[in-house]
Amino acid sequence: EEDIIAAMTDEVQLALLPSIYYKCGQLLDMGRMTEEAHKRGIIVGFDCSHSTGVVPHHFSKWGSDFAFWCNYKYMNGGPGSTGSIYVNKKHWDEMPGMAGWFGNNRSTMFEMRQKFDSAGSATAWQIGTTTMLSTAPIEGSLRMMREAGIENIREKSLKITGYLMYLIDEMLSGEPYNYGIATPREDKRRGGHVGVFHKDAWRINQALVAKGVIPDYRPPNIIRLAPIPLYVSYHDVWKVAQVLKAIIDDGDIEKFSDDKSTVT
């Protein structure tokens, strides 16, 4: 965070920051980043694709200018699901840089005026009609998430990721396993996934998939594991730790190439 603040120089007009660093899972203090940016006259927004649905957000309280995110991760919208945006009220009177008919005032939309009649809210930043099949799953997921409560989801997320890190520390950090944790240990500094590093991360990633575990590989040596609080149990996490151990004990990684041409 200090490096980011140091980069907020007089040459910077707009800062777009990740809420969570996608490799290691570090959670930025978005309130602090907003404050520091505004002190310097910088407009600031956040890409919250890796935090939405697992971390509470208070954009209006923080005064953040804008944010956006996908809904196919913790929001359970599935691949190709509709994305979302937040625009602070203080910007609602501004003209979107790319205005589209779906951002028009609904009452005049079909008058097809030559001049854009803004919807006067974050809706104005919509461009075209969203597809219903890409949006419907999000509605169902939101109902479940409201019932569970984002604070409860966050609490379980911290506990279950903490448990995963504990298992790796206790069982898998020494020889011959040599797994390490790239994710910050402090609760306030981590999001919903754990970055596990290993010199053979790519081959381990493939071995995990073959065993029914769905991780992500990120260069050069990170395996991302994301226990989704809504439906992943502590027993599931324990079983993943056993698989991480077994693929080393049984030499399973030797079955896989180190060729990294595949996209994960």
Regions found by a protein language model. Name each.
Residues 76-81, 86-156, 162:
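Active-site C-terminal subdomain of aminotransferase-like
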Residues 5-6, 207-264:
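PLP-dependent enzyme catalytic core of the Aspartate aminotransferase-like
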Residues 11, 62-66, 212-213:
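Glycine-enriched alpha-helix->loop->beta-strand junction motifs that scaffold or abut catalytic
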